[in-house]
Design a protein with these regions (language model features):
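N-terminal basic, low-complexity leaders that serve as flexible interaction/assembly modules and, when applicable
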Residues: 1-70, 359-361, 365-369
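Metal- or metallocofactor-binding catalytic centers and their adjacent structured scaffolds
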Residues: 5, 38-118
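Hydrophobic faces of well-ordered beta-strands that scaffold small-molecule active sites
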Residues: 47, 136-139, 165-167, 194-198, ...
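Glycine-rich, aromatic-flanked loop segments that form ligand/cofactor-binding clefts
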Residues: 108-141
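Metal-dependent enolase-superfamily TIM-barrel catalytic cores that perform enediolate-based chemistry
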Residues: 128-241
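Shared catalytic-loop signature of beta/alpha-barrel
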Residues: 212, 218, 229-339
């Protein structure tokens, strides 16, 4: 049953409330690229990727529409590994990461969704999982909030049933971060899992100083203290600090993750299927981590990642933060007693409200066999 139709759409979606972190500054909107693959039976696989502040979204859509659609037209959608390698090598001269990996991700997620439709299995079962439940944490994008506002947000997360929370760090002065983390620890209690995310704000020396200052608050992990490509810096963090390190959301290939785990240091590898190239490389990163005795976590698109974490044996926490996309989902992620529950419908079960998104569409493409 070959692919007979391919539809691609690009959107620029305003956020209801602007967000802020130490790297991107204020974020007022996000970009979304959606791919729909249709086979001869009329079954549809949906995939998507996203950007911050809509930067690069048009280029990602163009890569898919101009360079990947011709490769996919008439192809066997069940040959996911083969198609992934063909996409990689088709784009490698201008890609090997970056926007090429974003483009591949939207296609690869659609292929896996279509496989689930064809086999009448939810993605988490297709991957070999035996439980749909995954521990989840609330990912706050809250660097601009006052300490009072930060704690009020945390109380809202507790009311929603979360049993773990992540906050942002990376303020202008380390003393501000210490004060804010201290307030959160006092609010949440000594045993509540609390993560902190610096969004690559620091140099290695600054990160070591921050880890030392924050160690007494027993963070579950310190996320992205430095840029992820700095292998020597991560090796130093592993040797010279005692706070667990999570990183990887800004790595765009399996090779980069393997190098980080081999030559650098990470306690919680953090691949993002929407930016890494899709589900196929995400699973490979999880296997590499498992071979090293490391748990894997996630970043963004929690409606996809809940399946992936439920499908691997070395899952840690699922980050829950939809970046505004949840407004356009017909069914939102289900939470129960601090755990996210992957849908039991075939594929990934993400049903986008395309009518609701239509006012924000900036480009569209369609190809028929």
């Amino acid at each position: 049953m070959p692919i007979v139709e391919i539809h691609t759409d690009q959107y620029r979606v305003p956020l209801e409330t602007p967000l802020s972190d130490s790297t991107h500054g204020e974020m007022s909107d996000f970009g979304l690229v959606v791919v729909r693959l249709v086979d001869e039976r009329g079954q549809i696989g949906v995939g998507y990727t996203y950007t911050v502040n809509n930067i690069g979204t048009g280029a990602i859509w163009k890569i898919i529409d101009s360079d990947l659609v011709p490769l996919l037209q008439g192809a066997d959608p069940g040959a996911i590994d083969t198609l992934w390698k063909k996409m990689w090598w088709r784009l490698h001269f201008v890609g090997r990461g970056g926007m090429a990996s974003f483009a591949m991700a939207a296609v690869d997620i659609a292929l896996w969704d279509l496989r689930g439709q064809r086999e009448s299995l939810p993605l988490w079962r297709l991957l070999g999982g035996d439980s749909a439940e995954v521990p989840a944490y609330a990912g706050g994008i809250d660097l601009d909030l006052s300490t009072q506002g930060l704690c009020a947000q945390a109380e809202g997360f507790l009311d929603q049933g979360f049993h773990a929370i992540k906050m942002k760090v990376g303020r202008a002065r380390l003393s501000e971060d210490v004060e804010r983390v201290s307030a959160m620890r006092e609010l949440l209690g000594p045993d509540f899992p609390l993560m902190a995310d610096a969004n690559m704000r620091w140099s290695t020396d600054q990160a070591i100083a921050a880890a030392d200052a924050l160690e007494k608050f027993d963070l579950f992990w310190l996320e992205e203290p430095i840029v992820p490509e700095d292998l020597a810096g991560h090796a130093r963090l592993g040797r010279e600090t005692r706070v667990p390190i999570a990183t990887g959301e800004n790595l765009h290939s399996v090779h980069e993750f393997e190098h980080l785990m081999t030559y650098g240091h990470v306690d919680f590898p953090e691949p993002d299927a929407a930016t890494l190239g899709g589900i196929t490389p995400w699973i490979e990163v999880a296997k590499i981590a498992q071979d090293r005795g490391l748990p894997v976590t996630s970043h963004g698109i929690h409606d996809i990642h809940v399946h992936l974490l439920a499908g691997v044996p070395n899952a840690s926490y699922l980050e829950v933060h939809g970046f505004g996309l949840e407004r356009f989902l017909k069914q939102r992620l289900q939470l129960k007693e601090g755990k996210a529950i992957a849908p039991d419908s075939p594929g990934h079960g993400v049903a986008l409200d395309l009518d609701g998104l239509r006012p924000f569409r900036q480009a569209t493409g369609s190809s028929h066999d």
